[in-house]
From Swiss-Prot:
Gene Ontology, cellular component aspect: cytoplasm
Associated pathway: Pyrimidine metabolism; UMP biosynthesis via salvage pathway; UMP from uracil: step 1/1
GO molecular function: GTP binding; magnesium ion binding; uracil phosphoribosyltransferase activity
Cofactor: Mg(2+)
Protein name: Uracil phosphoribosyltransferase
Activity control mechanisms: Allosterically activated by GTP.
Cofactor note: Binds 1 Mg(2+) ion per subunit. The magnesium is bound as Mg-PRPP.
Similarity annotation: Belongs to the UPRTase family.
Name of a matching Pfam family: UPRTase
Species this protein is from: Pyrobaculum aerophilum (strain ATCC 51768 / DSM 7523 / JCM 9630 / CIP 104966 / NBRC 100827 / IM2)
Record-linked InterPro entries: PRibTrfase_dom, PRTase-like, Upp_A, Ura_phspho_trans
GO BP field: UMP salvage; uracil salvage
Length: 211
């Protein structure tokens, strides 16, 4: 499956805590922040690097510079992605930030998504756009958000970041944007009749903000 699983042991530990129904909102929110940072570090491994010579207080040393950190744009899906993006920004402090507010709508058993606010920075061809949403379930919300990204320009790389994804969500995104890169901490098999991921972790936004 064309998705990169973040199998770092601490990421999997945090996911276990997030899945636990007994984890309170404060710890849940903190867990999303920590996961965002870990995922950010994993993404940084995919950036090109160059070796540079620097002066320490005591002599010369050879180090590494990561190319393109100033080209990162992080787009968050309100509100569930806020803690996750807080962690991503710790890994990419130079990133420009975009926000898309989406609301699920269900009519006659059909789930759709309405976008009621969108503010995405202008996108250049050498930008790396990271779209973050904790749950990639049906892929409908993510698809709507990616459409907003492309209205702002065509990025050099499009990266989708989720805590938990499903085969359906992955397929929906890649069928429209085959060059998209998807990162998740886990892929769960199914959705229930409310389009929530099973076993998943529940409603990420409600659990993070105690609503």
């Amino acid at each position: 499956m064309p998705v990169r699983i973040i199998d770092h042991v601490y990421a999997q530990y945090l996911l276990t805590k997030l899945r636990d129904k007994n984890t309170g909102s404060i710890e849940f929110r903190k867990g999303l922040v920590r996961l965002g940072r870990i995922i950010g570090y994993e993404l940084a491994k995919t950036f090109p690097v160059k070796y540079v010579e620097i002066e320490t207080p005591l002599g010369k040393a050879v180090g590494v510079d990561i190319i393109g950190l100033d080209k990162v744009v992080i787009v968050q899906v309100l509100r569930a992605a806020m803690p996750l993006v807080e962690g991503l920004v710790k890994a990419f402090p130079q990133a420009r930030l975009g926000v898309v507010a989406a609301k699920r709508r269900e009519e006659g058993g059909v789930v759709d998504v309405d976008i009621f606010y969108s503010k995405v920075p202008k996108i250049a061809e050498d930008d790396v756009v990271i779209v973050a949403d904790p749950m990639l379930a049906t892929g409908i919300t993510m698809s709507r958000v990616i459409e907003e990204v492309y209205r702002a320009g065509n990025p050099g790389r499009l990266i989708v970041v989720s805590v938990i994804a499903t085969p359906m969500g992955i397929e929906r995104v890649l069928s429209r944007w085959p060059s998209a890169e998807i990162y998740a901490v886990a892929v769960d098999p199914t959705l229930n009749d409310k389009a929530f991921i099973v076993p998943g972790l529940g409603d990420a936004g409600d659990r993070a903000f105690a609503t």
